Each structure stands twice: as C-alpha cells, then as structure tokens.
C-alpha cells in the first residue's frame, strides 16, 4: 500500500506534501483527486494534523463531503475525523450536525454506499459524544481484511533490514485493518443496480405485512428504515399509524441504528428526548452491556416501572466491566445508562457565580455529607475517564439545548401570528427553567476569547423579555439574546466545579435518585422529583422565583400536545368540543391569570401559555375554525395569552404594534425586523446587563442569534463559507476592502442558528423610515423617497466633515468587495431588503438563497453583473470623484486577486457540487465550469482591467435590469427602491 506513494510519478507530490508551503486547501484538493491511492491518502491526512484547529474546523463540511460522496478504500480521513472528534468537543458536534443533514438528504437511498458511510460514521461520532465508558470499549484492531494483513506481514519481515519501516507504515496498517469488508459496500451497490425493480416490489409487499411478522432481517430493515426517513426533521407527524408517537424532533437521529428489534419493541410516547430501553440484552447476563447499547435522543420511556428496574440493573454494573462491545454496531448510546445514569447534571454555580445567593443549599450540603471523599475519585476513575465524563455531560446538554430551539419554530408555525410572541416567551422560559444555566455554549457563533486557556463559554439564560418573533412570509424565525459567561468551563476533573458535577453524577447513579426532566418535552422517569429552588439574583424582588412543584411539573403539560392518548390530543379534542365548549373547558379559559395576578411564577406562566397554544393549534385543525363560536373562543384564548405575556418583564412594543397589519408586505416585515435588530448593540447590552441577575459577574457577556429553519440554510452556510474564503484571499494579498464575516451553524438538514448583524439596517428600512418621518413632519410634502446620500448627511454630517468622508470610504471599500463577490458567485435577489448599511457606512449583503445556479423564479431577471445604481455613484461623489476612482481601482484589484487564486474557489465548488441536492448546484457539474468562465482566466492583466471597467462596472452602472427588478419588488412586495 505504501509503494504507490514512492513510485516515480508521485515523488514530486510527496515532496510537495512535506513542504511547509503545502496549504490546507492543497490537502483537501489532493484528497479529492487521489481517492484511489491509500498511501497518498494517509500521507495527506498525516499533513492535516499540522494545521491549526480553527482552520480544520472551518473545512469540516468539505471533510464530510469527501467521506460521503467520494468512494475510497482509505480509512485515513475517517480516522482523522474520529481522532479530532475525540479530542475537541466542538469538532464532534459540528461533524454530528453535518452528518444529520446528510442523513436527511440520503433518506430515499438507504442501501447506497453514501448512506451506509454516513450511518457508520455518525454511529462512531455518537459513541464519542455520549459514551463515557468508550475508553474501555476497544474496537477490533483487525477485521477480515486481507491486504492490511498482508502488508503487516511484509512490514514485520522487512523490519529485519529496515527497522524504521515498521514505525512508518504501522499507523496506516492499523487504520486500514479496522475497515469493515470493502466487499460489503460493493455488494450493496451491485445489488441495488441489479434489483431496483424488485426492491420497489418488496417495499410494497413489506408495507402489507403486519408488525413483528418479518421472516428475514433484510426485509425488516428495508421496511423500517425507508418509511421512517421519508419525513422532514422539522415537520410533526399528524397522521401516523404508530399512535404512540405523535411528534418526533429529528428523524435523522432516530433512524441511524442497526438494531432492528429496537424499532418494533419500543413504543415512542414522548418526543424530543427519549431513552432506548432495549440497550440491555435480554439474553446476556447483567455483568455487561448489550453490544447494541444505544443513545437515541428520540426514543421514549415506555414505562416508569420498567425504567426503574432497568436503572437498578445498570447501577450494579462495574464502571470498567464492559466487554464485547462492537462500536460499529452502535447507534446513539443510551443516555440513561451513561455515567451516572442521570438525565442532566446538577446545575450548580461555577467560580464566577459564587456571589449569587441561593435560597436552598440543602441539596448541595447533603451531597457533600453523603458522598465519601474516596467515592468522588476512586482509584478506578483516572483523569482520562473523568475528563470524558465531563465531555459527555457537555455533549448531552448541548444537543438537548439545540433540539429544544429547533422545535420552537415548528410549534410557533402552528400558532396564530398574534399569539406567537407569547408562545415564544413561554417556550424560552421553560428552557431557562429546565436546562439553564448549564455547561452549554454555541460552537462557531459565540466569540472565541481565549484559545490558549482552552475554556468554553457557559450559557446562563435566554433573555425572555428581549426575544422576538421575526416576521416572515413562510417560516417563523425568532431572535434570541443569550447571556453567558465567557471562558468559564473546561473539562479539567481536578477543579472544584467539575468535581461537584462528577460527584453529583456518581451520587445519582449510586442511589438511583430520580432526576427532573431535561426539557419541556421529556417525561419524568420516576415518581419522585428532586426539588431545586434556584434564585437568579441577590435582589429576589426583581426576579420571578422559579417554583418546582410536583403538581405543576411540565411533564403533565407536555403530554397534552404530544401524546395522542391524552385529553388534548387530536383524537380526543374533537371539533364539537371546540364549537360547544363544556363548563370544564370554559373554566379553563376563565382561569388564565389576569393582569393583576401577583406573584405568578415564570414556570406557571409558561405552563399556561403552553396550554393556550395547544388549544389554539387544536382549534385551527378542528375543521370548524371559521365558525362564529370558534372565532370567539380563539379571541378569548389570544386575549388571555396577551395578558399572560404582559406578566413577564415589560418590553416596549408600542412602535412595533403600529407597524403591524393583518397581512404585512415583505417591506413591512423587513422594517419590523430591522426595528427589533436596529438598537445600538452597546446600548442594548448595557441595558440588559443592568437588569440581569448575572450582570454583576465579571465575565458576563451577551450575544444574539436568529434561530431559523428552511431548506436553504445549508446553502446559505456554504455561501458564507465561500465569502470568507474570498475575503481571506484579499486579506492575504493586502487588498484594502471590507466584508462582513457571517457565521451560520447548521444543526440539521433544515434548521440552524444565524449570527445577527448588529448596528445595521437594510437600505429598504432606512428609506422607508426616513421617508415616512419626513412626510409626517411636513418636511416632505411631495413624498420624495429618501436617498442614501440623504441618510449619510443626516447620520455622518456634512460632506466635508471627517466622519462623512470616513463613512464614504467605508462604503466604497465594501461596495467594491461585494460587487465582485456578487458577480463571481452570481448572488441574486439583490433588492434593498437584502442589502444593509452599518453604523460605519459599510454596505453588507445578506440572504444568499440564490447563487451560482439558481435565481428567483428561475428567471434571469437580474442580468447586470452586479448591483451598481446611480444612487450608489451619487453617494461616492459621481463618476469623476476621487472616491469613485478608488472604487474602480479596488474592483480591479479584487478581481485580479481572485483570478490568481481561482483554484481555491473553483475546487471547493467542484468538491461540494458532487451529488448535491442544494439549489445552487442545479447546473450539476457545469456549476464549477461556469464559475471558471466568469473569472476570465485567459485574459492578461491589462485586458482584465478593461474587462472589469468596461464590462462589469460599465454594464452594471445604472442598469435597466437593476431598475426594473427594484421597481418590481417595490410594486409586489413594498420594498423601497
């Protein structure tokens, strides 16, 4: 295997790989081009370990794409991903979420090599993330692979004369030896090509066979996987034959298991966080765990009694007594059986939180009394294991938090618009009560402040009062403000804070203590609840106390909208009940707390809002939502929700309410959203800090994100990645232009978190707000639309002032950069709602739903190379001004720099377009070909300058197509041109 890398044609490549100038991009490029050479693959992956972690994390989507779509016998890249996932928790999370997106994309091809590769890798990643005992579980060093064994024999023989050869080839032999039989994947594709029609027939036959009557494992697998993966991860099940499952949070996780029996023996009763009860083998003794032990975040607790029995069995197992474990057969490890067997860690204060007052410290004191010192760190628990225990705790908390956010948008979409804000506040309050504060941060989005300290941030709470639902025509994105402590947590088991986490987890495992449920959708596993009274400030009169009571635990509430067996399910909540409400129903409506109700806890408010949201949802789905009685009931529920909403801390929505209408246009929605985002960031941050119970902590900080869902999120993330790469090229070549580095964290195929742009407003909102204000004040009787130049005058002063000149130059530098980016990447839909201006005068493009191959309405309406209006040129001082000449010069420099480094952009697009279903790759393999053509690589420098000035700028300046598109958006969507 190593011979192919030392042959004469590859000697030059080997020298390049070992050269210090060999970049990370070069590694990715060569990995794509040498998938058939195991030796070259291993040498390239060996080079990957020499690059900084931040650069490797940036290219995670490309690494996953290489593994999924490029067939290779090499195990090198997979071993690299597994190694880094074990070493860096953020790396494993991002890989995990990217794999979830691929699972959804490949849901209709479960027999394909790509699907099998994704399932195999996601199983290993989940084992790393959720299995604390994995260091005692060793996969077979060698499988039934002839070639690695043969090379190993040769290495042993050659070591007599070449002792160093063994150390050189041993890593490659060990990696290849772990590979499953390559024949398996070949047979899968071979079978698929020969029996395509027969497979479709078998699927239809399997659908007619009753459950449990499968005579053969293959048929059972085919019949269980395919239908299960046919649904979006964010769409609830409404009509399903499995009445025990009414709602699933993410199907891409639920169907990655190899254990077919689990699917038929488990009844799914709760969504979002559920425990697989068949992790223990019924045929094996209680001294070790079943090889198919699963952590399935979407499986349910079937019965409290059964879980209690299972827990008592698990607690008798020695920590290091796992034997015969097959990592490759595992899907999600069972959260109920991992380290301590609790569902969430005890939420205690870190060193930075010691100044907070607690009303009840009895739990902490009891634990300190009852846990012997030697129990915390017994000889069997070395630091490696304890570190892994902390990392697993972090991974659990992180995935639970992200899934909770994912499901909020889904539920908000089922609530009337006028009640969405109330429902959002209720959902966020429940997350605060059940999950936070905890060992959670947001990879990629929360700012990195101290790489040297290797510490992570800790989310304290979601600010309920500042959160808002963003207005959207189709989906329901919402804005979050997250309070966190920077550089707060790590995985060092010797710190006092981490010792408390470990001790409490051991305490829970040793005494089978019941644990309160993780989130608003999980079921309480046992009959007893651990009461934890948390006070969030030393001034309790300013913060609502959180009450934990067995009678008001959300478990009962969450059963209402999710379990079809409950009284509020779609089966029992009939249309007649809605049209003619009973006395009981009327009393429920009348029992909503009024505006004058005092001392109502946050939890009670959240519960009441959840009930109201469920009733509204059932009302709309009853089929009689348009009747007069239903209309009256709906109004009554909405009024109650608004009353409940006002019982949270106050928030000024007076101006916002003036903007709202029954069916707002896109322009009105954009202005409304900009109002929510437009407040000066530092002012908002200081205001929230003063009102926060945690604001006095020295490392307190605030960030804002937008939770979105939609099919174009992976495409937007890819566009942001391309823009970052282009910006890096310009920075490396010292070209003084400016772009905004936007970040999008993909958490599934159609959900994610988007970094917000602070201190900026869309050009549409600027024009609309200034124009309407001038009309109302009598200064603009003719209704003339304000221009950007008018805006710059009002914000930055006179044209001769230093602030105006600085803002003008900032506008020119950013305009040049985004102009070239829009042309090269063919970014379309460039109306003024998708272009922003920040507080320094920079222009910023957002919303990259159309690029490379696709355009709005599949019509090439925007035929100009990029958007360069007469208004932009007017702001630059006209075509004869010095600033305009600077803009033209920067455009030329940017374009020539991209041409000189064109292989980076072209190759990344070529890599990602293979077998992709993203709309931006509608042209297939021609996508990268057309990109290369746009860069005009055949031109010399002089001709390139002429091309930029005469073609790109000349055809864009005042283009008729641009004016027509802006007018079209103005007429149809109300977006100012």
From Swiss-Prot:
Renumbered residue ranges of the record's region Catalytic loop: 826-834
UniProt keyword annotations, A-Z: ATP-binding, Kinase, Nucleotide-binding, Nucleus, Transferase
Ranges where the PI3K/PI4K catalytic domain occurs: 679-960
Stretches that traverse the bilayer: none
PROSITE patterns associated with the record: PI3_4_KINASE_2 (PS00916), PI3_4_KINASE_3 (PS50290), PIK_HELICAL (PS51545)
Catalytic reaction equation(s): a 1,2-diacyl-sn-glycero-3-phospho-(1D-myo-inositol) + ATP = a 1,2-diacyl-sn-glycero-3-phospho-(1D-myo-inositol 4-phosphate) + ADP + H(+)
EC number per UniProt: 2.7.1.67
Subcellular localization, as worded in the UniProt entry: Nucleus
Superkingdom, taxonomy of origin: Eukaryota
Xref: CDD domains: PI4Kc_III_beta
Annotated Pfam families: PI3_PI4_kinase (PF00454), PI4KB-PIK1_PIK (PF21245), Pik1 (PF11522)
Biased composition (Acidic residues): 250-261
Biased segments, Polar residues type: 220-233
Gene3D superfamilies: 6.10.140.1260, Phosphatidylinositol 3-/4-kinase, catalytic domain, Phosphatidylinositol 3-kinase Catalytic Subunit, Chain A, domain 4
GO cellular component annotations of the record: nucleus
Region (Activation loop): 845-869
Stretches assigned to the PIK helical domain: 1-125
Region (G-loop) location: 685-691
A Gene Ontology biological process term: filamentous growth of a population of unicellular organisms
InterPro entries named among the record's database cross-references: ARM-type_fold, Kinase-like_dom_sf, Phosphatidylino_kinase_fungi, PI3/4_kinase_cat_dom, PI3/4_kinase_cat_sf, PI3/4_kinase_CS, PI3K_accessory_dom, PI4KB-PIK1_PIK
GO MF annotation: an example: 1-phosphatidylinositol 4-kinase activity
Region: Disordered, residue numbers: 205-261
Note, other: The C.albicans mating-type-like (MTL) locus contains, in addition to the genes for the regulatory proteins (MTLA1, MTLA2, MTLALPHA1 and MTLALPHA2), a and alpha idiomorphs of a phosphatidylinositol kinase (PIKA and PIKALPHA), a poly(A) polymerase (PAPA and PAPALPHA) and an oxysterol binding protein-like protein (OBPA and OBPALPHA). PIKALPHA is not represented in the genomic sequence of strain SC5314 because that haploid assembly includes the mating type a allele of this locus.
Biological role stated in the UniProt entry: Acts on phosphatidylinositol (PI) in the first committed step in the production of the second messenger inositol 1,4,5,-trisphosphate.
Similarity remark: Belongs to the PI3/PI4-kinase family. Type III PI4K subfamily.
Name by which UniProt lists this protein: Phosphatidylinositol 4-kinase PIK1alpha
Organism whose genome encodes this protein: Candida albicans (strain SC5314 / ATCC MYA-2876)
């Amino acid at each position: 295997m190593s011979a192919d890398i030392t042959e004469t044609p590859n000697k030059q490549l080997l020298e390049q790989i070992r050269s210090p100038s060999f970049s990370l991009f070069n590694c990715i490029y060569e990995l794509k081009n040498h998938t058939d050479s195991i030796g070259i693959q291993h040498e390239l992956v060996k080079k990957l370990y020499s690059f900084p972690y931040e650069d490797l994390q940036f290219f995670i989507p490309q690494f996953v794409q290489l593994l999924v779509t490029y067939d290779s016998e090499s195990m090198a890249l997979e071993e690299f991903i597994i190694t880094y996932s074990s070493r860096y928790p953020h790396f494993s999370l991002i890989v995990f979420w990217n794999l979830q997106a691929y699972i959804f994309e490949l849901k209709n091809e479960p027999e394909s090599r790509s699907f099998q590769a994704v399932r195999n890798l996601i199983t290993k990643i989940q084992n790393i993330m959720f299995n604390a005992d994995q260091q005692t579980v060793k996969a077979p060093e060698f499988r039934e692979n002839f070639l690695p064994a043969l090379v190993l024999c040769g290495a042993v023989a050659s070591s007599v004369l070449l002792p160093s050869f063994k150390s050189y080839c041993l890593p490659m032999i060990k990696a290849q030896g772990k590979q499953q039989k390559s024949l398996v994947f070949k047979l899968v594709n071979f079978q698929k090509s020969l029996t395509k029609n027969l497979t479709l027939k078998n699927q239809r036959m399997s659908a007619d066979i009753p459950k449990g009557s499968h005579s053969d494992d293959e048929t059972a697998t085919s019949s269980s996987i395919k239908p299960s993966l046919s649904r979006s991860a964010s769409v609830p099940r409404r009509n399903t034959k499995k009445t025990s499952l009414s709602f699933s949070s993410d199907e891409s996780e639920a169907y990655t298991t190899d254990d077919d029996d689990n699917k038929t023996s488990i009844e799914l009763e709760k969504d979002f966080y559920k425990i697989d009860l068949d992790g223990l083998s019924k045929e094996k003794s209680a001294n070790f765990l079943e090889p198919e032990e699963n952590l399935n975040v979407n499986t349910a607790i079937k019965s409290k009694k059964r879980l209690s029995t299972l827990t008592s069995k698990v607690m008798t197992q020695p920590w290091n007594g796992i034997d015969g474990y097959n990592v490759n057969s595992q899907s999600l490890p069972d959260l109920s059986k991992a380290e301590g067997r609790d569902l969430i860690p005890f939420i205690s204060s870190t060193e930075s939180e010691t100044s907070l007052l607690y009303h009840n410290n009895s739990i902490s004191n009891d634990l300190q009394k009852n846990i012997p010192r030697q129990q915390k760190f017994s000889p069997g628990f070395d630091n490696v294991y304890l570190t892994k225990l902390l990392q697993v705790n972090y991974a659990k908390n992180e995935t639970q938090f992200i899934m909770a956010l994912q499901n909020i948008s889904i539920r908000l979409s089922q609530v009337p618009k006028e009640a969405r804000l109330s429902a959002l506040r209720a959902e966020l309050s429940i997350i605060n009560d059940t999950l936070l504060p905890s060992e959670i941060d947001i990879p990629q989005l929360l700012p990195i402040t101290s790489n040297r300290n290797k510490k992570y941030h800790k989310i304290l709470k979601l600010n309920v009062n500042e959160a808002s639902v963003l207005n959207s025509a189709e989906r329901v994105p919402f804005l979050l403000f997250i309070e966190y402590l920077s550089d707060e947590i790590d995985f060092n088991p010797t710190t006092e804070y981490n010792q408390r986490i470990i001790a409490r987890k051991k305490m829970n495992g040793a005494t089978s203590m019941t644990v309160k449920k993780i989130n608003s959708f999980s079921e309480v596993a046992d009959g007893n609840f651990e009461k934890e009274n948390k006070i969030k400030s030393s001034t309790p009169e300013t913060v609502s106390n959180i009450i934990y009571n067995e009678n008001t635990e959300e478990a009962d509430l969450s059963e209402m909208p999710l379990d079809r067996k409950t009284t509020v399910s779609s089966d029992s909540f009939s249309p007649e009940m809605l049209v003619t409400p009973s006395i009981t129903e009327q009393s429920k409506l009348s029992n909503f707390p009024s505006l004058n109700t005092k001392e109502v806890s946050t939890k009670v408010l959240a519960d009441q809002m959840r009930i109201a949201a469920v009733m509204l949802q059932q009302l709309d789905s009853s089929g009689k939502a348009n009747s007069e009685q239903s209309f009256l009931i709906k109004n009554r529920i909405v009024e109650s929700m608004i009353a409940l909403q006002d019982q949270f801390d106050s928030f000024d929505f007076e101006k916002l309410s003036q903007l709202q209408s029954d069916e707002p246009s896109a322009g009105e929605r954009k202005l409304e959203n900009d109002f929510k985002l437009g407040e000066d960031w530092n002012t908002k941050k200081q205001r929230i800090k003063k009102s926060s119970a945690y604001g006095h902590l020295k490392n307190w900080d605030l960030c804002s994100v937008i939770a979105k869902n939609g099919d174009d999120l992976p495409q937007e993330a890819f566009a942001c990645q391309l823009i970052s790469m282009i910006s890096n090229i310009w920075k490396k070549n010292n070209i003084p232009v400016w772009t905004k580095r936007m970040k999008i964290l993909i958490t599934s195929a159609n959900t994610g978190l988007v970094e917000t742009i602070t201190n900026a407003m869309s050009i549409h909102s600027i024009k609309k707000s200034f124009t309407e204000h001038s009309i109302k004040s009598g200064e603009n009787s003719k209704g003339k639309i304000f221009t950007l130049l008018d805006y710059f005058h009002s914000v930055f002063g006179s044209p001769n002032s230093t602030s105006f000149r600085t803002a003008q130059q900032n506008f020119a530098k950013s305009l040049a950069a985004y102009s070239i980016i829009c042309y090269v990447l063919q970014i379309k839909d460039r109306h003024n709602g998708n272009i922003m201006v920040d507080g320094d005068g920079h222009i910023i493009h957002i919303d990259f739903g159309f690029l490379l191959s696709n355009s709005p309405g599949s019509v090439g309406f925007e035929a100009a190379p990029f958007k360069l209006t007469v208004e932009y040129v007017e702001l630059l001082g006209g075509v004869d001004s010095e600033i305009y000449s600077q803009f033209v010069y920067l455009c030329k420099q940017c374009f020539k720099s991209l041409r000189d480094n064109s292989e980076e952009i072209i190759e990344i697009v070529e890599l990602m377009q293979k077998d992709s279903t993203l709309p931006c790759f509608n042209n297939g393999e021609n996508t990268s070909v057309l990109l290369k053509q746009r860069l005009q690589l055949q031109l010399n420098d002089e001709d390139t300058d002429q091309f930029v000035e005469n073609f790109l700028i000349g055809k864009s300046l005042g283009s008729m197509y641009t004016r027509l598109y802006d007018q079209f958006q103005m007429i149809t969507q109300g977006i100012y041109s």
